[in-house]
């Protein structure tokens, strides 16, 4: 990339990278005329828009950032997909490999549980209310654990773009889970039985000795917090849901142009100048249904949102 040749009063050459199609950088004072500057900015904006989707083409689900955001987002996505044709969805699920692999003794009960996902759904053009969203998210997390138990040895390199570049020509679901979450498969199954939206600790009774005051030396029982690992959902879980529900996932990050540098940056808030940039595809061109998700960093950590087309 060429650099800005503007020379200041001291004879110092700017040297910053030029804007696309321009002979100067992002600083307005380095242009001979305001028209030249505006044209340069316009060119940068047009280049930025290429390959990105305007944020106003989606509505964001605005799920809670409580560790269960992926499960909540997928719950809203399934709600949107199923529309009012629930019977077709149930028929497809009964015929799916996921349902067929379940032990015969649990099939009927599991189908009832699956139906519970949708029993209160009414308007697919709205997002789920908080209570139903949580119920569905809990079931979805349990489904991921069951899928893991049955399909841990399955090769997943063809389901998600880029896995082969990291793990080589072959990668099992177990390897993908253990590498992503940095725990063993047994630890994953045990840990993810507890809903991700619940507290990341439990209270344990502990005997302690009072060291100060008039009760000094007396032994009492107190409740203390014991931390447990977070149970967030990520790419392994998206891969599972892609197979379960016949979905192709597109994961986007929200971006905007920085007003100072005119370079793309992550947008903390979605506004009219926000665009979505595709960073990951799962089950590309294979799923009957396409689901778009947003991924951004918030105070609590990485955060997923379902993006419903307007």
Predicted regions and their residues:
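Intrinsically disordered, low-complexity regulatory regions of eukaryotic proteins
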Residues: 1-50
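Structured beta-strand/turn binding interfaces of compact recognition modules in eukaryotic regulators
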Residues: 7, 17, 28, 66, ...
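Short, flexible beta-strand-to-coil junctions
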Residues: 8-9, 243-244, 254-258, 283, ...
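Asparagine-rich low-complexity intrinsically disordered tracts
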Residues: 10, 28, 32-39, 268-281, ...
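Beta-strand cores of modular interaction/reader domains in eukaryotic scaffold and signaling proteins
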Residues: 24, 59, 70, 250, ...
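Papain-like cysteine protease catalytic cores
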Residues: 40-60, 64-260
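Beta-rich nucleic-acid/ligand-interaction surfaces
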Residues: 256-271
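A recognition module on extended beta-rich or small alphabeta surfaces enriched in W/G with H and D/E
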Residues: 272-310
């Amino acid at each position: 990339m060429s650099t800005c040749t503007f020379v200041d009063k001291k004879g110092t050459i700017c040297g910053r990278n030029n804007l696309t199609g321009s002979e100067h950088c992002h600083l307005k004072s380095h242009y001979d005329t305001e028209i030249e500057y505006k044209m340069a900015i316009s060119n940068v904006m047009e280049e930025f828009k290429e390959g990105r989707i305007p944020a106003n083409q989606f509505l964001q689900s605005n799920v809670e950032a409580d560790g269960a955001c992926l499960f909540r987002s997928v719950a809203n996505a399934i709600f949107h997909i199923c529309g009012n044709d629930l019977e077709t969805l149930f028929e497809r699920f009964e015929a799916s490999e996921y349902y067929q692999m379940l032990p015969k003794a649990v099939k009927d009960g599991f189908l009832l549980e699956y139906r519970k996902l949708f029993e209160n759904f009414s308007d697919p053009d709205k997002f789920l209310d908080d209570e139903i969203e949580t119920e569905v998210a809990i079931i979805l997390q349990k489904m991921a654990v069951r899928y893991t138990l049955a399909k841990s040895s399955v090769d997943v390199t063809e389901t998600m773009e880029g896995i082969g570049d990291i793990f080589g020509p072959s990668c099992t679901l177990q390897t993908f889970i253990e590498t992503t979450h940095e725990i063993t498969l047994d630890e994953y199954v045990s840990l993810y039985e507890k809903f991700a939206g619940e507290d990341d600790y439990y209270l344990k009774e502990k005997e302690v000795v009072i060291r100060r005051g008039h009760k000094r030396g007396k032994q009492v029982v107190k409740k203390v917090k014991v931390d447990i690992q977070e149970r967030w959902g990520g790419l392994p879980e998206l891969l599972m849901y892609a197979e379960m529900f016949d979905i192709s996932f597109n994961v986007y990050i929200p971006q905007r142009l920085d007003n100072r540098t005119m370079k793309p940056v992550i947008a903390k808030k979605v506004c009219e100048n926000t665009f979505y940039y595709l960073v990951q595809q799962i089950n590309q061109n294979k799923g009957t249904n396409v689901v778009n998700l947003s991924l951004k960093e918030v105070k609590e950590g990485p955060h997923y949102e379902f993006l419903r087309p307007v």
